[in-house]
Amino acid sequence: RRRAMDNLAHAMPHLSEGERHDLAVRSLESMFQLFMVESVATPRLVTPTSWTSHVTFAPSHPLLQRALGLLLERRPVILCTGHCGNWELLGFVMTMLGFDMTALARPLDNPWLNRWILGVREARGLRILTKWGATEVVQDILDRRGRVGFIADQNAGDDGLFVPFFNRLASTYKSIPLLALRYEIPVVCGYA
């Protein structure tokens, strides 16, 4: 909660302390509901015949048409999302629809919870790589014209690339742009 309050103070200094507190509480509640409740329900509710009841899809949007075109071309692509919307649903639905996907993830600190969420993530075929030491595996996937997904809004630590974000510098992964440049491949950003 302290981290959320500190981040909100930097990002939204115009809000009062009480407004920031309320926003932090609502945000944490939403994250919990999204992660725990929706992740439990997703494999049961979102199926090849019911997914359109749970996912809004705008195939006529020009950017989405371009992204789908890249995915259908069977060429290597880097996909990025953040901790916004329902990132778990995004990977689940993409693999359920037949897109071959591998995603990088940080293991959860709780081993039981980590095993459970891996089962949910892999239920429809999403392959999960532990983000630490995955460089060679990611390069092999891209060499084979595969797709790799990143949740790009995580702290990359002291070795990351520092970029301006809500009035201060934040560390993000250098690997995403470096891989895109090395392989001359597109980076597709989106959310669910």
Segments and roles (model prediction):
Residues 1-81, 114-119, 123-125:
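Membrane-anchoring hydrophobic helices of lipid-metabolizing enzymes
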Residues 18-19, 104, 131, 190:
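Residue-level detector of family-conserved "landmark" positions at structurally sensitive sites
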Residues 43, 75-132, 155-170:
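Catalytic core of membrane glycerolipid acyltransferases/transacylases, capturing the structured
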Residues 60-64, 113, 131-135, 172-173:
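Amphipathic coiled-coil/heptad-repeat helices and related helical stalk/stem segments
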Residues 64-68, 91, 117-118, 138-139, ...:
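Short amphipathic alpha-helical segments and helix-helix/interface helices
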Residues 71, 95, 122, 142, ...:
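Anion (oxyanion) recognition and catalysis
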Residues 99, 133-192:
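Membrane-associated lipid acylation/remodeling enzymes share a hydrophobic transmembrane-juxtamembrane segment
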